[in-house]
């Protein structure tokens, strides 16, 4: 096993060195160290053993390529082979970012569903761009993500696994996350990626595993053969709409029971499609990263913040914003203050403290505020973007709303957010 010492220097391919400062963490494949690189603190992932020529060459290609998006902690430099191993340099994880697995064990919690949806959209966007670039990730699991619990900002790590689609990199994946065809010895590819993605997304929302329920509890010992079955071709989705034999246990899988009940029907049906028997056995039937992203963007438009919440902590997802709404946490009725109707027909629900996102952007441009005027409360919208908004009243008068300014919302008002996007205000 190859481990490094504080103060030790490691040579980089193409020239330069890093100096080991301290260990940050370790896993089954390697150890991550904080290092000094040209006077700046960075991270070095160092493999416990030499992973072979195929893996090394693939890592070299990744270092020389452009990351699909800023969400990827992409390999910056690769080391020379030394001390019977090698590694690569990447940026350090910023403070406030946690591994996805920390959310499963309640070491940290998401602030609200806005942050969960934001994380989900970022995950889907990242892998959509990766796949459009002709790459597959090949080893998608809960250890690949660092997430900010407050806002859902996301970083994707372990990008040494990334390889050209349908190319053998020497990596198969992690048990409980691999597609059935990979469990059976197939080469990971984009279609196996999207199956692993569905597992990750289910775990993000349910904080539980989609293939663990009453059936899997029957096994006292999970041998390799049993695991290959229950997480491979024999996998039964816990909420399968036809086969209820693997339903979550009410106590052991408490999170799954509670959170499934909070899910809107559209999200339930998406998981049933993406993780059902048809998708397990037939890769062409799987939901794509683009389909997932579009669903989460739609759910974000319809996200409701409970008026009883002091901030944004109590929010919930719905499918029909025109129906009678009740907060699942406090049980009180909720009224939508206003809708924004965009040119493409989509509607955006506004309730107090609700953030406004345009299209699939990962940056909010506004937030709904409640203010008092003439002895009554009214809903307003605050501009938090860098653009001045053009506001047209129902009578045709034009006003300009600068950054941080708030305007009361009136029925029939039209807001031009930028050169491409205009919405009409509909007061409920």
Model-inferred region functions:
Residues 193:
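Conserved catalytic-loop aspartate of Hanks-type protein kinases
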Residues 127, 131-149:
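Catalytic-loop of the protein kinase fold
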Residues 47-69:
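The N-lobe alphaC helix and its flanking beta3-alphaC-beta4 segment of protein kinase-like domains
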